[in-house]
Amino acid sequence: MEIVYVYVKKRSEFGKQCNFSDRQAELNIDISPNPELAALYVERNPVDTGIQCSASMSEHEANTERFEMENCGVNHVEGGWPKDVNPQELEQTIRFRKKVEKDENYINAVMQLGSIMEHCIKQNNAIDIYEEYFDDEEAVEVTEEAPSAKTINVFRDPQEIKRTATHLSWHPDGNKKLAVAYSCLQFQRSPMGMSHDSYIWDLENPNRPEIALKPSSPLITLEYNPKDSHVLLGGCYNGQIACWDTRKGSLVAELSTIEFSHRDPVYGTIWLQSKTGTECFSASTDGQVMWWDIRKISEPTEVVIMDITRKEQLENALGAISLEFESTLPTKFMVGTEQGIVISCNRKAKTPAEKIVCTFSGHHGPIYALQRNPFYPKNFLTVGDWAARIWSEESRESSIMWTRYHMAYLSDGAWSPVRPAVFFTTKMDGTLDIWDLVFKQCDPALSLKVCDDPLFCLRVQDTGCLIACGSELGTTTLLEVSSSLSTLQRNERNIASSIFERETRREKILEARHREMRLKEKGKAEGRDDDQKEEETALDLDELVNKAEEEFFEVIFAELKRKEAEALKKKPKPKKASIEVEGEDELEDIAGEEEESGIIMGEDTGEDDMDEKNEGGAP
C-alpha cells in the first residue's frame, strides 16, 4: 500500500512525553485450570457449517422525472414585405421602399426617433463603451498556499534485474502517457541477463506498462515526436539511433547503421521543429553532434565535432553529455560536456570553425542538465557537480546566479514551463528540490524526499502541475505540486526579468574589474621585466667600461716600459777601464747616479742592465 499523504504535526501537539523504563516481570493474577470443567468437555463430531459463495447483492431503487422531447421547426422569411411583394426581386422592393418613404406616418416616426438616435450616436463617438481597460494584463490568480507536493503514482520496472530510469518523455497530446528509458550506466558492469526493454506507461494504470519498446541495445534517451505522438526517437548505449512507430508494434521501425553512428553512448536526442517533423539530432560522449532524418536514418546528414580549438580533430573533442535546443532559436543549439564546459554552437555557420560560437566554463564535473528559460531564452540553467547555475549569454566568464554546494551530487534539473522564476533539481540522496527565485534565492522553496534511492532524471509536464522523477532502481515517481508552484504569480515575469538583468549587470561590472586588475598585473610584470633588463644592461656597461680601462692602462704601461727600455739602450755605457779614480768624492757621485737609475726602472732595469752587461761582455 502506497503512502499517499503524510500528515505532519508539531512536537508540542503530541502531549506529554511518555517515559518508559525496564523492570522485572511481575505476576499479578494466576487462575489454575478447573479439572471438573475439563471432564465435562465433549468434542462434537461431525459439525455442520454453512458457506455462502455467491457475491453479496443489494437492491436499490431510484425515481427520476421523465424527460420528454419533441421536434420543433421555424421557417423564417424576411419580414416587413407584403405578400404581393417578392423580396428576391430588386425592382419590387425599391418601388415599395419609395412608397413607404412618402408616407406621413413614416416621416413623423423618423423625425421623432432621429433626435434620440443622434444623441446616442454622439455618445458612442465620444466614449467607447466596449473598451477593455485591463485587456493587456493577464488574469492571474493570487494564491497564498504554501509550496507543497504529493505523490500521485509510482511506476516500477517490471524486470527482476532492476535498471536505472535514465530518461523520461511526456506524451505530446494530453500528457496522459509517459515514456521511460531504462539502462545500466555503469561501464562494463551490466549484469548477465539484463533486459533491454523500455516502456510506455499509462498514468492511470501503474501496474502494467502499456507498450514495451524492444531495442537492440539499452536506451539512454527516449523522446516523443511533438508532431506525431506515435513516433519515438531513442539513443542507444552502443551509439545507434532508433525510431519506433507504436502503430507498428514494439520492434524498431528505423535504425542507424553502426558504421555511421556514434562511438559512445548517446546521451541526448532532440526533435527539430521542421515542416516534415522527421528531422532530429543527437549528441554523445564521443564528441560528435549528428543530424538525422528518420526517412533515411542509415547515416547522418551533418556532423559537428565538439573541438573547442576549432581544428576539427576528434581526439581533441569534448564528450557531450547533455543537449539543448530552443525552437525560437532554430539556428542555435548548446551542448554540455563531461569537462564542465557549455559549448554554444551555430548550425548555419559557413565553416566548421565558425559553428562553435563560444564556451561557458564553471562546473567541476559533467553537466547533466542544460535548458534555456522558456520565458527568457538568453538565460539558461546548468546542473552539474554539487550546484546548479543560471547563465546569461551576455556574460561568458561566469554564471550570474548559482546555488550553494550541496552534500549530495546533483543529477538533473529543469525549468518550470509556467513560471519563469521556478526550477527543479534532483539529487543523489533521493531528494527533489524546488527553487522559487521570487520567494527566496539562498535555499529551495520546497525540498521533498521522494525515495531512498538516488534520483537520476526528472521531467516536468507542460502544465507545470506534474513532475516525474526516475531513480537508480528504475522506479518512476509521479508528483503533483501545489497551485502556488504551478500558477503564474502577479508581476512574476517583471520580477524575474529584473532579477536576471540585475545579476547580469553585476557580473559585467565584476568582469570589467577583474579585467582591469589583470591588465594592471600584466603591466607590473612587464615593468619588472624592463627594470631587470635595465639593471642587467647597466651591469654590462660597467663591466665593459672596467674592462676597457684595464686594457687601456695595460697598453699605456706596456708603451711606457718599451720607451724606457729604448731610452736605456740609447744611454752611453760607462767604460770602467778608462775611468781614473781621482778621489772618493767622484766615486760617490757615480754610485749615486747608478742608485737613482735602479730606483726608476725597478726590477726590469736590473734585468736590462744584466742583458747589456752580457752583451758588452762583463769581465
UniProtKB/Swiss-Prot annotation:
Keyword annotations of the record: Cell projection, Cilium, Cilium biogenesis/degradation, Cytoplasm, Cytoskeleton, Dynein, Microtubule, Motor protein, Repeat, WD repeat
Keyword Cell membrane assigned: no
Disulfide links within the chain: none
Gene Ontology MF terms: dynein heavy chain binding; dynein light chain binding; microtubule motor activity
InterPro entries, alphabetized: Dynein_IC, WD40/YVTN_repeat-like_dom_sf, WD40_repeat_dom_sf, WD40_rpt
WD repeats: 214-254, 261-302, 362-401, 405-445, 450-489
Subunit structure: Consists of at least two heavy chains and a number of intermediate and light chains. Interacts with DNAAF2. Interacts with DNAAF6/PIH1D3. Interacts with HEATR2; probably involved in outer arm dynein assembly. Interacts with CFAP53.
Family: Belongs to the dynein intermediate chain family.
Stated name of the protein: Dynein axonemal intermediate chain 2
Native organism: Rattus norvegicus
Lineage: Eukaryota, Metazoa, Chordata, Craniata, Vertebrata
